[in-house]
């Protein structure tokens, strides 16, 4: 099978999102051919270069999302009219709100209008050579303004001023850049058997257009739902970009785009049930949804997982990226309660800060730990020691990630916000008992192999930790069960095998019949066998339970 792998800001670049799982997927499926179509996220990412590519990668085509030169295309009167109609329909659909903001009938009509406008713009870009100049023009801003002022538009859209309109128009121009690419010809995405978008949003746009122009089926994988990410980041920009009108219109655009992607995809995979619920909320058909857990390398934790008795029985370990969402403050307060019941308990916090905010938060946590737990000494002549330590991977105390997990009897996760808890899976690979807060996909990942408590509840967190510290046999049982669960569900091998099966299923259900031409350009006879169009059920079917088999003689008499 020839796969067109679509990425945004990741593979095959050295830096970026989702690069590791894409690389493992491509390397693990050596029986397939891969064409990589990558949208880069920054100039620095392009300068960093690519990872080494395996031989099954046939070609790589890239395009920058962070910059686009003016294509120099000047539209004639007819092309301008087509652009005004399509862009006007797109803007009108956005001004009516997102996919979940209206009634079912009107929402379906607006979804059709959005999809038709999107494909109309793509066809215009294909015919005229690009959309960049038109999307950056003053005419595009005026079209957007008319849509915002039209009767029936969102109230927040009516309030959009010139700076807000310019911000929305600029965002739409960047988001629609894939429409102007030359990837959709017969020697590009039109030649693949299946498009696999490694995320939603811009990465899935080329897959939508390949389906529109060439009938190529689309598979979409989301380990983090792009629409949710947009919602979380919508307040982080400058004032004119976080105004209510801008947020409403851009949320409508991303919501409509997500609904169109989910509607046209042959299959949509989520990394966990949390992401799957978001996909259903955004319009994905439940029949198309599959859960494929992220695949992680278990080999580096094998030695620790097979030697569960190496841990200090009094040590709690937290491992992760230091930032406010990890709620280390609650963990420190909980550890104060733990020390009341288990005076020998120690807490190791292993991780580096995430940016300036993380560094400030780490400083705050260190000050709080010094205040809550003054240095203690065993005797009058001994040196005082703090029961809480802050370390980083690579330091003498924690040379490797596996050794950090190995040092603890109980691994603690105290987050208030979490997507897929990678650190929790790593602890499970190590065969360690865990105490986690009920956020994100924690319950789905841990199952019944660890203790789960409400977030922002230091007392509940402390009680769970004390219960495990006092019961070594229970820790051993939970650790063994957690390791078995992780090896069954979260390895690279199961992830690769799941996608291999999905590829074959999609291609078998939606085969592409292309017109085969000979050297002279004439149709090649017998290129497609007649049985390719023969209707029938090719899968073996079993009679329903309790049914009576009919003999051939009786069937002939009928």
Segment roles from a protein language model:
Residues 242-244, 362-399:
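Nucleotide-activated donor-binding/catalytic signature segment of Leloir-type glycosyltransferases, i.e.
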Residues 300-337, 346-353:
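Conserved donor-binding/catalytic core segment of Leloir-type glycosyltransferases
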Residues 402-408:
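Short alpha-helical donor nucleotide-sugar binding micro-motif in glycosyltransferases
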Residues 416:
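Aromatic "clamp/platform" in nucleotide-sugar-dependent glycosyltransferases that forms part
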Residues 433-436:
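Short hydrophobic beta-strand element within catalytic cores of glycosyltransferases
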Residues 439-452:
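Short acidic/histidine- and often glycine-rich active-site loop of Leloir-type glycosyltransferases
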Residues 451-458, 467-473:
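Conserved acidic donor-binding segment of nucleotide-sugar-dependent glycosyltransferases
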Residues 460, 474-489, 495-505, 515-519:
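A short, well-ordered alpha-helix in the C-terminal region of glycosyltransferases
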